[in-house]
């Protein structure tokens, strides 16, 4: 019985032949984009229908859904094939990115249907990130619109170099050649600086199928290809096989003591047994001994193939490393310039710390300079202090540790990255690396003989940063001042960084916007780190309202060195105390961006020390702090490290 079942489940010769034929076809990834209601989903539905990709039960369901949700009268509404969300069907719009696979005898396709509404531009950018070609739809009645320009500019920024200009709904203007030519010329004028290699204009009616897969009888004046003819024949390959070899290591394959290989997918270029390879960041080299695949050893592996590489030598390599060609290595730097498309409802702020993830690396990163925002309607450069959702900007980025990369123009796989919010773990932005910053390559750490351990030994204490956070009027400065006096009286070496005092000097140029608050804390955290490196016990007393910046400050310090102290006083009590009269003015609207009133305060979730002040004196708070300090032997010299040799 088991033998019969296995035999019945085995692929037939016909299936094998079909699969073999599919493997030989090239794959084209493309997306549809343009303004809302230009017919993007309808076009994809028409393509799927005319290329026989719809089963009978799907067609029956489509006819039923068209009667319920359709916008085409008694005709089938092909847009419903790809608008799967209930909200999309109810509103007749696309919200999320929908991917569909289909094939013709000549080629395989993966198409991304992207939304047209401006508030979903980030979804469109997601679809464009892997596409080779973009179909930009334009309603023949409307011409080139704001969102048409926006999507075209984003497609250009994301490396798409081939455009099909689909002038849709041509039937609604009487198949007028003059309308088609006017729109074509308008789009060419707009896009002349966007770097597109090809722009192929095609007049069509997605609803009725004119010039989609069959030539229109109503447009004898048009002699160009139908849409499917162009998609089947367009050459978009960027010769990734001819690019320098890049192999991001996904994991170390070690099934037994006698085998050690490095598994991953070849991102670009090719490799063969005997080829020399280099670990991108360490510079260690070896040679490829074997290329192992599921079907056996290979004589060569090229871009797109998932393989395991076995090397001649026992080179230290782990997940996240990248094997590369020694003749054309990627750049390794901790500072670079990049295009960023912002996805999140909370703005990108220079100075705020994010997690940056590339094909190979993950590290902390900060936008050190927002150079300008790109107006995606006319490509103009605009001054900006932040990037809001769906905006695009050019930024300088600094990473905590060096990463290996190519520019996005050279390699779309190793030149791209995403930014992740440290608190929510949400992907908040996507970036394309433009170039490394020369100053990053020319600045090196100077080796110094006197280090943190030596300085701390001399003071007979362990460095620490006590970071006091809480609302204005919570008692931070009072408690911090008493705490320093008690430490100083016992012979400890201390320094207080107070929020108000620092704004008279180091941060006098900053205001109280969210962006300025982020920069305020970034500067203070760097100063606190330097003071801890000097062996001091640093007491920082700042409202520091945002969790992300407090986490950034923590990561600057050595393990166990950062002590978050939450001075927890209810808002009502702080407003009652109001020692500086600020709450009264803020509640009257005289002060803007006041924490707790019209600017948020994100309370610590797990502070090392939680001081609940209501009904307790400042002296009691200091006693609790000192008890915590003594329990952890902060007064004792730190353990030996490599921080100094004297």
From Swiss-Prot:
Q: What are the start and end residues of every segment in region (Adenylyl-sulfate kinase)?
A: 462-646
EC number(s) recorded for this UniProt protein: 2.7.7.4, 2.7.1.25
Task: Enumerate the Gene Ontology biological process terms.
Answer: hydrogen sulfide biosynthetic process; sulfate assimilation
Does the record carry GTP-binding as a key word?
A: yes
Task: Enumerate the residue ranges of region (G1).
Answer: 34-41
Q: Where does ATP bind?
A: 470-477
One GO molecular function term of this record is:
GTPase activity
Catalytic activity reads: sulfate + ATP + H(+) = adenosine 5'-phosphosulfate + diphosphate; adenosine 5'-phosphosulfate + ATP = 3'-phosphoadenylyl sulfate + ADP + H(+)
Please state what the protein is called: Bifunctional enzyme NodQ
- Origin organism is Rhizobium sp. (strain N33)
Name the lineage: Bacteria, Pseudomonadati, Pseudomonadota, Alphaproteobacteria, Hyphomicrobiales
Gene it is expressed from: nodQ
